[in-house]
Amino acid sequence: MVRDSMAAAFRPSNRVLLQALQILVYPGVGGSGSVSCRCPLGAKRYLLTDNVVKLKEFQQKKVAVACNLSGTKETYFRNLKKKLTQNKLILKGELITLLHLCESRDHVELAKNVIYRYHAENKNFTLGEYKFGPLFVRLCYELDLEESAVELMKDQHLRGFFSDSTSFNILMDMLFIKGKYKSALQVLIEMKNQDVKFTKDTYVLAFAICYKLNSPESFKICTTLREEALLKGEILSRRASCFAVALALNQNEMAKAVSIFSQIMNPESIACINLNIIIHIQSNMLENLIKTLKNAAEGNLSKFVKRHVFSEEVLAKVREKVKDVPALVAKFDEIYGTLHITGQVTTDSLDAVLCHTPRDRKSHTLLLNKRMVSRRTFQPLSQSLLAE
């Protein structure tokens, strides 16, 4: 009871959070004016894995739908246009097929009109209904039409059509790739406005967007979202936390950066390792910094043990920091040489390291499970191995 009342007292209200978001995205509404993106453009990498975006599966389904279509695409489009003008009922299957047949901006314009009609006819019967949102956003992803997805997602007449987190996440990822961070933040605002549940991917995207905007306002948003998530009992991923740490460091919020970093479980990723070095640099912990690098360079020599890898950019910052301390410069130069010899230095910037998307674990599992029968005995592999 006491814990619940404390949480309620410290929980940021949606209104306050949304106001902060809107000030950042629409500077004229309030705040201190325009926001400049001070962080380097760096790697414009996607943040979502393939098993979330599912673009390949969508494209395969498009081919299958086109092959199974009775008649031509042009006839199908013409019949749908006729149904629109005659105010006839749009069926679920017709919209699904249409979204799989679209290949151009003009086709998407037709799809948008059909979506408006379909939603107007069915918005009161959405419980358990087919989720068209991800399908439309994947279509926009494929055709490079992110503005169409943003337009529909923000339209109040389509409230409830994009009721799933996947639609918002894929669109934010698409905008992130193109460096349209303010537009991505607008999508985040809309997601918050529509009370769509945030997932682990949402927090990664939200914190990455705030990190790229790199302003006092975006730092405030990131901090508020993080605190709100923790109060709800959400478990934030290591990737999300790394973006939050990097943003705090860029904003010279050292105490916050250290606090967030200390809460990361298993901080052994390349991003964590390099962020830890930056924390040491900005905290002037030079002796510990050199000791950390030395331990990494002289650690277990077994090829089966994963070694720590450091960004050349980060190591350059270390050298700049210790250049006025001759004893430390000598130690660093020796360690630097060892790290290069052992292959523990990458040319990737810290930004590229942060934005790197790990491969899907699911794909590895599928590869392992792909062949379940012995080619020699035609028995299940487990039985075959025992027999041999």
From Swiss-Prot:
**Which Gene Ontology terms of cellular component type are present?**
mitochondrion
Classification via InterPro entries: mS27/PTCD2, Pentatricopeptide_rpt, PTCD2, TPR-like_helical_dom_sf
Q: What is any Pfam family matched here?
A: MRP-S27
- Residues carrying Phosphoserine: 382
Q: Which residues cross the membrane?
A: none
**Which PANTHER family does the entry link to?**
PENTATRICOPEPTIDE REPEAT-CONTAINING PROTEIN 2, MITOCHONDRIAL (PTHR14700:SF0)
Biological processes, Gene Ontology terms: kidney development; liver development; mitochondrion organization; mRNA processing; muscle cell development; regulation of gene expression; regulation of mRNA processing; ventricular cardiac muscle tissue morphogenesis
- State what protein this is by name: Pentatricopeptide repeat-containing protein 2, mitochondrial
Organism lineage string: Eukaryota, Metazoa, Chordata, Craniata, Vertebrata
Q: Which UniProt keywords apply?
A: Mitochondrion, mRNA processing, Phosphoprotein
- Protein purpose: Involved in mitochondrial RNA maturation and mitochondrial respiratory chain function.
Where are the annotated PPR repeats, by residue? 166-200
In terms of superkingdom, the source organism counts as Eukaryota
